[in-house]
């Protein structure tokens, strides 16, 4: 039996690059919850069905501000009073190529359309069965949420800045935390990483980039 051990961010990036799923856990003093995550560019009916069947939480599409503007998405509420200021927009659906919109196939298509680089706003309608969330510019260095973390991983994996996330619930309807999360991860052979580690990873990497840029500047005497 595997020990309850968090994976490093490098291993999560490798999984994301290969189109795989993984779990991100936020701080104990925040939601203290785990989300199943994969890059939106790798969406498939199979992955959506896995989330719906095993994750049991709300399946959401995380987007950056730029993509949300292309879709002219309005916030779900003009005044965000949610505890963690999660930036939900109106729900969406692909205008064409779907049936009722709720099937794994339909939701997968909606996500594919909504994350196209050249998407037109009339390709998406509201309301629908996919729930977009807009990430803060600056990612986890600005807001340590699953929304920002999922997009940061996508960007670090050299993929479009969008992801699909779903909270993990236990069979009894309670939120999966701690040992329950590791049990879930072990059962489904998924790796778990902490958002706190992603924050540290970004600080370290971006500091090194700045130092390299600084050292490349030659001052003439």
Task: Describe each model-derived feature in a short phrase.
Residues 1-221:
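Catalytic domains of riboflavin
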């Amino acid at each position: 039996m595997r020990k309850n051990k968090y994976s490093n961010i490098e291993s999560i990036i490798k999984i994301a690059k290969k189109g795989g799923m993984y779990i991100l856990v936020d701080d104990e003093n925040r939601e203290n919850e785990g989300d199943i995550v994969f890059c939106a560019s790798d969406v498939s009916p199979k992955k959506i069905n896995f989330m719906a069947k095993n994750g049991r939480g709300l399946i959401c599409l995380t987007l950056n501000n730029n993509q949300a503007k292309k879709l002219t998405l309005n916030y779900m509420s003009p005044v965000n009073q949610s505890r963690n200021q999660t930036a939900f927009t109106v729900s969406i659906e692909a205008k064409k190529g779907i049936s009722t919109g709720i099937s794994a196939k339909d939701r997968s298509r909606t996500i594919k359309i909504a994350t196209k680089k050249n998407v037109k706003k009339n390709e998406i309608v509201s309301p629908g069965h996919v729930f977009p969330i807009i990430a803060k510019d600056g990612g986890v260095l600005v807001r340590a949420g699953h929304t920002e973390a999922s997009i940061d991983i996508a960007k670090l994996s050299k993929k479009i800045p969008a992801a699909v996330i779903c909270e993990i619930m236990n069979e009894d309807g309670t939120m999966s935390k701690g040992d329950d999360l590791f049990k879930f991860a072990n059962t489904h052979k998924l790796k778990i990483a902490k958002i706190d580690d992603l924050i540290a990873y970004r600080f370290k990497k971006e500091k090194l980039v700045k130092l390299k840029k600084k050292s490349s500047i030659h001052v003439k005497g």
